[in-house]
Amino acid sequence: MKWFDKTVSQRQEDVLRLLKKYPDKIPIYITGQNITLNKFLLPYDITQAQLMYTLREKIALSPTESIFLFFGKRREMMPSNMMIREIYDKLKEEDDMLYAVYSKENTFG
């Protein structure tokens, strides 16, 4: 069953099960163009910049492309030096998952 086909309570149960098994991880669901794997468990002590670096590698961006991450329902941009744990605590959804959308832009040429 796809993630968004589940009810909020089913998604929350799944997330709570993951958090119990991996208490030092942050569950995040990332959407955007050219991404095949959407759900990630991230270390709580990485910054948004480190996540963006990992994401760049996963989607194989060219050196001329920039990536932008938007978090939560309101699609907020956060400082790149902000810890993922802080973003999670501030913007996690009712199912305890942090949602993000990335956008890429040809900015360097």
Task: Tell what function each PLM region has.
Residues 1-109:
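Ubiquitin system architectures
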